[in-house]
Structures are given as C-alpha cells and as structure tokens.
C-alpha cells in the first residue's frame, strides 16, 4: 500500500519544446498540483459560480408602475358590458407593464478560496494525466512578434481546436503573436482558473509561467 501511495504521488515529467522544434530538457509537474483526483461535482460548482459572477445582472423590465401613461381609467366602471379596467398599463394590455420580469441583481456566489484552488488542481490533473499539458521555452524566437511562427509552433504541439496559452504578463512578444489566433486563449499564471482549463483541449505553459504558478502554490520551482 505504501508503495502504491508513493507511486501515486510521483511527479509527472514533460518535455520542454523550443520554437525551432527541438527539446530543451524536461520539467517536473508536482503531483500535489497535477496528479490529484478530479472532483467533478466540485469543478462543476466552481465553474457555475465563475460563470454566474461574469453575468452583468443589469437586466430590467418595467412594471405597471414604471410604464408612463395609463393614469386615466380607460372607460367607466359599469354599464359597458366589458370587464372592469383601471389602467391601460396593466399587464394584460399591449404596452402595459411586465409581471414578475427580471430586475437588476447580483448573480455572484460565494465560493471559498480552498474550493477554487482544489477545483483548479483537479482540472489541471485531468489534463496532465491525458498528456494535454505542454511546456515551451517561448512561443516565438527572438523579440519580434510573429503570428505565423506561433501558429506553426502550436500546430506541432497539438492539433486540437481549443488551446489555452499560459505565459508571463511581461511576455508581450508571445501575447502579440497568438492573440489573433482562433481557438487560442491567453492567460497569465495568476489568472489560471478551472473554467478556462476545462474549456481548453490543451494547456501550453511557458517555463516561466509554469515556474510562477508552481512557486505560488507550492514551495517548489521548476528548472528546465
């Protein structure tokens, strides 16, 4: 049993690729971040809360009290043979108010930080176990942005449609190179979240970003 536990906690190793197609060593993915059981219910709860928090909640309809006009009784109370009416802005009239319509509200849900972190670990672990976590030295060689070069490089890493690229905030060359590519989403390490990881088919880290993420969540650092 002890041997099984040690095996389960063994760090994963992935190759580090360079823009010219070569392999520049490997990096270890700490088991505590990239090899934990995926709690589907937890990830669903966290993603639901994240998506709810993104809603503006500014929708608003007018009730009969908000609609202008309708202050005069449309016709007398009795003697017409028709149902009594007090205002043409009542909900049953065209141009009247809305019954039980949406009003501005806050959709955000309170989610503990530990739950958010655990869900992210589960999502990353799922991608890592299926060989969908990748590490690169940089997206393009040099300091000149090149969308064509970045596209070609990513195509050698994965042929799937949705790719999450995690790079440092200061890597403007990388950002400018991939920001217009369809199906490619860019995040910095501190922006990494469960929804974007699950939405992506593959996650591509720069070594710098991977190092920053691991350092912020463990006491280890990656060296390529």
From Swiss-Prot:
Its keywords, alphabetically, are: Ribonucleoprotein, Ribosomal protein, RNA-binding, rRNA-binding
UniProt gene name = rplD
Q: Which NCBIfam families match?
A: rplD_bact
Q: Which family does it belong to?
A: Belongs to the universal ribosomal protein uL4 family.
The record's GO CC annotations read: ribonucleoprotein complex; ribosome
Q: What does this protein do?
A: One of the primary rRNA binding proteins, this protein initially binds near the 5'-end of the 23S rRNA. It is important during the early stages of 50S assembly. It makes multiple contacts with different domains of the 23S rRNA in the assembled 50S subunit and ribosome. Forms part of the polypeptide exit tunnel.
Under the heading InterPro entries, the entry gives: Ribosomal_uL4, Ribosomal_uL4-like, Ribosomal_uL4_dom_sf
Q: What is this protein called?
A: Large ribosomal subunit protein uL4
Q: Does the keyword rRNA-binding apply?
A: yes
Q: Which intervals of the chain are annotated as region Disordered?
A: 52-109
The record's subunit annotation is:
Part of the 50S ribosomal subunit.
Q: Pfam families from the entry?
A: Ribosomal_L4 (PF00573)
Which terms does the record give in the GO molecular function aspect?
A: rRNA binding; structural constituent of ribosome
Membrane-crossing ranges are: none
Per the UniProt entry, what is one GO biological process?
Answer: translation
């Amino acid at each position: 049993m002890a041997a099984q536990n040690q095996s389960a906690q063994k760090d994963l190793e992935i190759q580090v690729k360079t823009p010219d197609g070569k392999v520049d060593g490997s990096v270890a993915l700490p088991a505590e971040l990239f090899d934990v059981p995926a709690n589907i219910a937890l990830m669903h709860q966290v993603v639901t809360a994240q998506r709810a928090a993104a809603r503006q909640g500014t929708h608003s309809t007018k009730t009969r009290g908000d609609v202008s006009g309708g202050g005069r009784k449309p016709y007398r109370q009795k003697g017409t043979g028709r149902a009594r009416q007090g205002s043409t802005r009542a909900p049953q009239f065209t141009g009247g108010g809305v019954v039980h319509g949406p009003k501005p509200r806050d959709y955000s849900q309170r989610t503990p930080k530990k739950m958010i972190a655990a869900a992210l670990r589960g999502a990353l672990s799922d991608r890592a176990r299926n060989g969908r976590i990748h590490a690169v030295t940089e997206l393009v060689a040099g300091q000149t942005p090149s969308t064509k070069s970045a596209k070609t490089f990513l195509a050698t890493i994965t042929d799937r449609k949705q790719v999450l690229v995690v790079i440092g905030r200061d890597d403007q060359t990388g950002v400018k190179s991939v920001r217009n590519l369809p199906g490619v989403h860019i995040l910095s390490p501190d922006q990494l979240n469960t929804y974007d990881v699950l939405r992506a088919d593959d996650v591509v880290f720069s070594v710098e970003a991977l190092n920053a993420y691991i350092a912020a969540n463990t006491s280890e650092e990656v060296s390529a």
